[in-house]
Amino acid sequence: MELLSYEKLMIGDELNKDSVKVRIVLCSNSKEGVGIMADEKSPGHQNFLSRLDAKGHVGEAYVLLEGNGEVTVFVGIGNVEEDILLVKNNARKAGASAYKCVSQFKNMEMSLTSEYMAREVVSGIMLASYKYRFLHKEKDEPSKKIAINSQSHAVKKAVVVGNAQNFARFLGDTPANLMNPTLFVEYATKYLQDKKNVTFEVFDKSFMERKSMNLLLGVSQGSAQEPKLLVARYRGKSGDAVDIALVGKGVCFDSGGISLKPSARMHRMKGDMLGAASVLSVFGLAADMGIKINMNLVIPLVENLPSGTATKPGDVHVGMNGKSVEINNTDAEGRLILADALVYAQEANPTYIVDVATLTGAMMIALGDAFIGYFTADDDLSKIIHQSGIDANDPVWRMPLSQLYLPSMKSNVADLKNAVEGGHGGSATAAIFLSEFVGKEFKWAHFDIAGVMDSNNNKGVYGDGATGCGVPVLIEMIEKLSTIIN
């Protein structure tokens, strides 16, 4: 099957002489009125806004066609004295609003008139530019070219992170019949094949059987699609010691299995591989950025479907580390494939292990789409993750990883059961289940991105479909870890 051309989603800094030049001017709101946030202010611009009675509210936008044919977009950022996370989010919304004002142009060279919140504004431009138009009969905007004209490190970083985030969104938005385990591997191969210092291999069902990855195999056995295990290595510095292993949940479609989900919104479960999409995107981005770190990537890929061969509620499978698990809910499958993948990742003896998954609906209830929930027993790692979330404008919230939850995961016929009765503490019990497959000597963190896989409160930025949230905080975390390790 021919792969879709995701490359057309990418934005760069290659300028085109025929491009429309678009300048973005941020406008703040305060008691004194609208304020222009520009390094060089024009009296004419202030008069323009005054005539329009502009307030600088978030999302407020005005377009001015200058005499030289250039376009200036004035966009509101609101009150800049608010909480820093709110201001950053408003700046991202401003970038998205600015893009939408000029999105009719096929060729644009965009620039900012101020460095204030430049990373966040450009992030908004990047995310708002994403449009999944690969399968329509009429393909709109086939030749649109956008360039961000800036020498700023913050802006350049926002562009490459935005491209990686949009790649993760593409993977998550592609229908499951076009993104099964085999096709995911083909996209991953295309994405990784030319990256410097990267090697990768793909293992099949027979390998998993030899490694006794029976939890992973148990999830996949209801589908005609064979499971895959994608393993990649990036060596950004000398030596072969592994600094960090990234593990991503790759359930390419999750029907719930025999514990079938309700049909309403089941179509969203094509995105149940966004953990895999996120770590793949971040891994490739780290290689592109040349981060001085040695990193492994482990992605288990399956479909979770009901059939005559599917795992049944009450079945018991023995994981790669020898622990037996009673499958009392086949819709709690992500933790099963992660368990074996985490055990496999430990064979390389990494210093840090980070797994990412759209794991629990309970996380949606707990944090909504405002924060990513994460779990770790390592306070130093937690501080790095928390600050990375702030710096990357991809906020996170630490959740309890406590042995107090473990008794609820005990089974009378196996070492563990895979889901708690009644769903109480669903995210925390899932995390403590995973901890049973990670050695205490490893610095481990678990990201549950289920709540942010799509967005209700930021549709002006993300639109419908996948958000790619998790990519910005992960690459920021990896950069910070590289400075500590080196």
From Swiss-Prot:
Record-listed Zn(2+) 1 binding positions: D254, D331, E333
Catalytic activity: Release of an N-terminal amino acid, Xaa-|-Yaa-, in which Xaa is preferably Leu, but may be other amino acids including Pro although not Arg or Lys, and Yaa may be Pro. Amino acid amides and methyl esters are also readily hydrolyzed, but rates on arylamides are exceedingly low; Release of N-terminal proline from a peptide
GO molecular function, one term: metalloaminopeptidase activity
Catalytic residue positions: K261, R335
GO biological process, alphabetically ordered: proteolysis
Record note on cofactor: Binds 2 Zn(2+) ions per subunit.
Keywords: Aminopeptidase, Cytoplasm, Hydrolase, Metal-binding, Protease, Zinc
Subcellular location: Cytoplasm
Cofactor: Zn(2+)
Keyword Metal-binding: yes
EC numbers: 3.4.11.1, 3.4.11.5
Any GO CC annotation of this UniProt entry: cytoplasm
Residues annotated as binding Zn(2+) 2: K249, D254, D272, E333
Keyword field contains Protease: yes
Quaternary context: Homohexamer.
Xref: PANTHER family: CYTOSOL AMINOPEPTIDASE, LEUCINE AMINOPEPTIDASE-RELATED
Function of the protein: Presumably involved in the processing and regular turnover of intracellular proteins. Catalyzes the removal of unsubstituted N-terminal amino acids from various peptides.
Family annotation (HAMAP family): Cytosol_peptidase_M17
Family: Belongs to the peptidase M17 family.
Protein known as: Cytosol aminopeptidase
